[in-house]
Amino acid sequence: MKRGLLLLLLYFSFLSAFAQQMDGELYNLAKTKSGYRSKRISSYDKSGYNGDRIVGIKPNEKVIICNIQGAGIINHIWFTIAPPPHLISRNDIILRIYWDENDYPSVESPIGPFFGQGWDESYNFSSYALTTGPANGTGMSTYFMMPFGKGARIEIENQADNVIDNIFFYVDYYEVDKLPKDMGRF
């Protein structure tokens, strides 16, 4: 009897030892963060119709995707582009990201390699901070944290010889009262 009680006590001790920690990542998802507001800028059609895209970016044309004022942290960017990669090279579409009202970009890269699709190829893959899919990697996402103190601007330049028919995008970010201490720049 004593042995059975001891085994039962040990069993419940092990259960509590291996239970989910109350300070883990899933627990922290449910916590509100004072001074943080979740925001999104996207290509949605403000008229309510289904024209959720930027249409017809001509060769050598630049388009501003977003211009955010104040402090914040971009936590997700998603793009999909038409025509597909075999008709317009993702190496000829340049992504530029500017921080804090700078005249020069901190990020300047062909959009394909920025999202992990080098060698002028498109394919599905998933990593911690980058993912592409579902159809031959045409949807491209990044989850890199990109803090900024005074503002952020993202632009696309078409350096291809043909028109970019459509660009669809999301830029998700936290608007913050003040950046956390010791935040660098991407």
State each model region's role:
Residues 20-186:
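Beta-strand-centric surfaces of beta-sandwich/beta-rich domains
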